[in-house]
Amino acid sequence: MREETREQPAPLRSGLTTGSCATATSLAAAKLLLTGQRDDAVDITLPKGKVVQMRLEFCRLIGECAEAGTLKDAGDDPDVTHGALLYSQVRLLAEPGIGFVAGSGVGTVTRPGLVLAVGEPAINPVPRRMISEHLQRLADACGYLGGFEVTVNVQGGEQLALKTMNPRLGILGGLSILGTSGIVRPFSCAAYIASIHQGIDVAHTNGYTHIAACTGNASEDTMRRVYGLPEIALIEMGDFVGAVLKHLRKVPVPRLTLCGGFGKISKLAAGHMDLHSRHSSIDLPQLAGWAADIGADEALQAAISGANTSQQALALAHAAGIALGDAVCAHALAFARSVVPAQVHVEVFAIDRQGGIVGQAGVQ
């Protein structure tokens, strides 16, 4: 009998950023105005020189303007904007230059601390440059000496933005037009880490001296309850504690609180910078060793080492009067202090699934 061979998974498919979509739709609309040519697809050049073709959903004249739209294709990345209609409207200006406007579903910057000034449409620098370069090349080819006004829109963008970090960063009214390479890499962490850095920058620039980096909603709720911190001072770090700690070398906020579930804090205590289960695991024998340091007998150490979960290990220690939660937080604190500058005061909280505090260290 022939042995069956396991089917190999297909490679994940990359997509294109909102910045690439805005570039393609702006180019198509401007081309219609300057040449009368109505395209079904356009070629754009990405920042590293790769040329890609993007299909258009429409390209049409509306009075003195033209608009073109495309569907955002994020490939196999679980991007909140995947499948959204992004469209740009272009108007010709008498004077040279390119102006950008936040249309429907695109946000506006309302707080200092980001790369864009307050009041600017949330169209990031690389997409602006991509759009400007493509429109300037078109203008040169057509002998056009005037300028362009580009309004970028995302259908449903105001609702989609509520699923992003934009409201917390002070980007209101819609999404940001993003991208540095023009390409969306499936399951890339770059965008999430960038939002963590932006959150710290915005809090710091707006004068907040105490921020809390939290692994999830329960830990954020705990920090609101304990310290009454506003949204701007709460950093949703998820599993990327390393992104927080390393960024504080550049932006040394005076006081940092780290808060997360006991299992994740135990990973931090063991020196892990990425707390996701793909990249780090809970070391139960290490927990047993820390319990031994604060008085656990051999039987309890064995029980902790053989526990099914970190929560069970914590419960076993608690029943024996061993403050394992505090011990784990103390080790997490020591590791965090080894990464951040000395002037940053760090404290650590561990919580259970209900948001109850099961350990703390360094608390003022």
Curated annotation (Swiss-Prot):
Pathway: Cofactor biosynthesis; adenosylcobalamin biosynthesis; cob(II)yrinate a,c-diamide from sirohydrochlorin (anaerobic route): step 6/10. It is an enzyme of class 2 (transferase). It holds the Pfam family CbiD. SUPFAM superfamilies: CbiD-like. InterPro entries: CbiD, CbiD_sf. GO terms for biological process: anaerobic cobalamin biosynthetic process; methylation. It comes from the Bacteria. The keyword Transferase applies. This is Cobalt-precorrin-5B C(1)-methyltransferase. It catalyses: Co-precorrin-5B + S-adenosyl-L-methionine = Co-precorrin-6A + S-adenosyl-L-homocysteine. Keywords: Cobalamin biosynthesis, Methyltransferase, S-adenosyl-L-methionine, Transferase. GO terms for molecular function: cobalt-precorrin-5B C1-methyltransferase activity. Transmembrane segments: none annotated. Belongs to the CbiD family. NCBIfam families: cbiD (TIGR00312), PRK00075.1-1 (NF000849). The gene is cbiD. Its EC number is 2.1.1.195.
